């Protein structure tokens, strides 16, 4: 068969999925030490930095899946928009990646928080667009093709948008870490400690649903069952 455009895209898609799922698992485990009051603040901050280092790979993975998926969808014939549309998708995705990576490098600064807010605004626009497009397609109104063995693409887009919603809430939680650790750096603060534990407990509950949804995205992409 040789090396084809579709084969390369599938390879990149697999890598993105691996870093997405693996990265989220790494953050999940590392975050436990962030709220451990028995550790020194320096040690807890070190674990928080480790979580950020792992999380950026997951963020790169989840963003990369969008242009890769749309590109492969065109080659598979389940989404009809190629040419300039795909170019625009790739350009916008690269811009989104640049924004996300910049927020990572400027983390724990006011500039980093502002960049993170812009990253969140992108999701606020993208999520409803994807939800509407996927549901509309499943109902037969487009923009994606539906028919025998074609529904999987719209289902996958819908599930992907759900992961973005969950991921957005997890972003809120990680952004809150930065604010709370600024407070804790000034000295012991029971209220900040309690809020840190509360937000992390919520994040861990969300993580279980997150992994199930990610696995479902992978299932429909791999099996194309409907």
Question: Locations of the language-model features?
Answer:
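Polytopic transmembrane helical bundles with strong interfacial aromatic enrichment
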Residues: 2-226
């Amino acid at each position: 068969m040789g090396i084809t455009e579709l084969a390369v895209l599938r390879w990149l898609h697999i890598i993105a999925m691996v870093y997405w799922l693996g990265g989220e698992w790494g953050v999940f485990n590392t975050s436990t030490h962030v709220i451990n009051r028995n550790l020194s603040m320096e040690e807890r901050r070190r674990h928080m930095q480790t979580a950020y280092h792992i999380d950026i790979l997951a963020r790169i993975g989840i963003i990369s899946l969008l242009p890769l998926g749309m590109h492969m969808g065109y080659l598979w014939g389940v989404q009809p928009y190629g040419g300039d549309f795909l170019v625009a998708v790739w350009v916008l995705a690269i811009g989104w990646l640049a924004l996300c990576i910049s927020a990572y490098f400027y983390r724990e600064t006011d500039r980093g928080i502002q960049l993170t807010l812009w990253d969140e605004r992108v999701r606020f626009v993208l999520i409803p667009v994807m939800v509407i497009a996927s549901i509309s397609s499943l109902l037969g109104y487009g923009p994606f093709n539906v028919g025998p063995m074609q529904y999987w693409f719209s289902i996958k887009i819908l599930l992907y948008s759900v992961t973005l919603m969950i991921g957005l809430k997890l972003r809120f939680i990680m952004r809150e870490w930065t604010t709370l650790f600024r407070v804790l750096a000034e000295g012991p603060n029971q209220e900040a400690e309690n809020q840190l534990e509360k937000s992390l407990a919520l994040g861990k509950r969300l993580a279980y649903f997150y992994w199930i949804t990610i696995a479902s995205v992978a299932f429909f992409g791999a099996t194309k069952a409907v």
